[in-house]
């Protein structure tokens, strides 16, 4: 049994005493110490991203005791929720079932794999309304899929929601004991001064390595343990297989087939010069009406990220998106490398130069999503395309990514001439810099954006 973050997280635990996801920085310590207004914390995230470890570690560090309930491994506990879901009743049941005293502020209650028990999810409403003094955290791997089912009564407005993503490159650097390198990268991102060439090359190698290993804790742990390349590949394949298993477990037969078909089409979708999702690449005659639900399932499961097209630059970007045109990206680089059979040696060879660009764009999509940005790209009459648009305060910033150091981009120039943004971002293997309104951001520093 792999303990997904045991060896990793202790190395930089003090640097991550908060969950940094979504549009806010939600500090778990602040949540614990809230005097009023605290609601149960509900953590979304793909399978094996580290949710269970985060919750149990938080309980061990900041509470006198923890009551851990896993609705997937213990079906019996879920039956008690069929009778009553008011908070006082649930507290009494948990105390008897686990033979432990639950004390407000001193006990953390964890509901794991809560999507397996509809009534437990609904009970969070009563913890929020009736007994806010109790500290409750819940999570589920397929939570996004589960709450989309009609039968679920989701506690709208009664929970604090947060999303966990795979470890980003900065977190992996921390895990490797390279905090000074990550700090230096952040410093040079801010001042736009080139990084020392030796450090620049070291950081680029870390980027290439990350593109293959990814950010799933099990894969990072195997990499840190210096497991053989075969063992590391097997772990990434295991993670991929767990995603595939979920497709059969949490969807009906018809939906499962279509989910598989969409997922299997992703390499071909991304290999095109124009990466807009095309249904015909799933199979001949495929239509949005047939496969829309399958795409939504993959998004809700945290397996893919969706990037919407915009043909205008105006703020807010989401108001001008074209819902019929989008791209899909893998949500983890290690899963992607396992799916396409990419190795570090192949990634750095000239034979895979074209696909290196695909990996780079997918990597940037993951990094932006992890930092809380909604994903959008810009296209103008099929003649010019900018990889990403991001909103920073009230500004819309175009982002172009290149796998190498050849950075001439006609589309970016078209965009800048048309909309005159405050500045643009170009991501490539080039060092930090700022010239002609374009901020040069090395590939390894996207976590700074």
Residue ranges and their predicted role:
Residues 51:
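Conserved lysine of the Walker
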Residues 73-105:
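Short glycine-rich substrate-engagement loop in P-loop NTPases that contacts/grips substrate
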Residues 147-271:
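Interdomain motor-coupling "hinge/lid" segment immediately C-terminal to the ATP-binding subdomain
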Residues 216, 220-390:
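Accessory nucleic acid-recognition modules appended to NTPase machines
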Residues 364, 368, 386-405, 424:
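Conserved catalytic cores of phosphodiester-cleaving nucleases, focusing on short active-site segments
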């Amino acid at each position: 049994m792999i303990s997904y973050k045991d060896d990793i997280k202790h190395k930089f635990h003090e640097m991550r005493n908060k969950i940094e996801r979504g549009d806010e920085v939600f500090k778990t310590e602040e949540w614990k110490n809230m005097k009023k207004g605290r609601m149960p914390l509900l953590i979304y995230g793909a399978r094996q991203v580290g949710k269970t470890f985060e919750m149990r570690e938080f309980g061990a560090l900041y509470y006198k005791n923890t009551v851990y309930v896993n609705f997937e491994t213990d079906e019996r506990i879920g039956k008690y929720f069929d009778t009553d879901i008011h908070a006082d009743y649930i507290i009494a049941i948990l105390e008897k079932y686990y033979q432990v005293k639950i004390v407000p502020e001193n006990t953390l209650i964890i509901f794991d794999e809560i999507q397996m028990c509809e009534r437990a999810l609904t009970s969070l409403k009563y913890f929020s309304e009736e007994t806010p003094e109790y500290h409750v955290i819940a999570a589920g791997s397929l939570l996004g899929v589960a709450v989309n089912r009609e039968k679920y009564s989701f506690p709208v407005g009664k929970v604090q929601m947060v999303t966990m993503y795979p470890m980003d490159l900065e977190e992996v650097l921390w895990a490797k004991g390279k905090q000074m390198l990550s700090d230096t990268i952040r410093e040079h991102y801010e001042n736009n001064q080139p990084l020392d060439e030796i450090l620049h090359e070291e950081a680029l190698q870390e980027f290439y390595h990350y593109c293959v290993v990814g950010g799933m804790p099990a894969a990072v742990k195997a990499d840190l343990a210096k497991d053989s390349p075969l063992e590391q590949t097997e772990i990434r394949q295991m993670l991929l297989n767990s995603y595939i298993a979920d497709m059969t477990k949490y969807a009906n037969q018809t939906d499962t087939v279509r989910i598989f078909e969409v997922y299997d089409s992703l390499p071909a979708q991304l290999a095109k010069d124009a990466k807009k999702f095309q249904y015909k690449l799933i199979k001949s005659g495929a239509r949005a009406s047939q496969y829309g639900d399958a795409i939504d399932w993959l998004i809700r499961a945290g397996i893919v990220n969706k990037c919407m097209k915009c043909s205008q630059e105006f703020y807010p970007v989401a108001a001008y998106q074209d819902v019929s045109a989008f791209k899909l990206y893998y949500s983890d680089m290690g899963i992607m490398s396992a799916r396409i059979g990419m190795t570090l040696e192949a990634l750095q060879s000239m034979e895979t130069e074209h696909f290196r660009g695909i990996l780079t764009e997918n990597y940037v999509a993951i990094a932006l999503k992890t930092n809380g940005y909604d994903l959008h790209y810009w296209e103008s009459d099929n003649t010019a395309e900018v990889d990403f648009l991001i909103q920073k305060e009230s500004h819309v910033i175009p982002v172009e990514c290149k796998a190498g150091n050849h950075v001439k981009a006609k589309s970016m120039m078209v965009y800048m001439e048309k909309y005159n943004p405050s500045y643009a971002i170009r991501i490539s293997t080039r060092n930090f810099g700022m010239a002609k309104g374009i901020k040069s951001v090395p590939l390894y520093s996207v976590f700074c954006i």
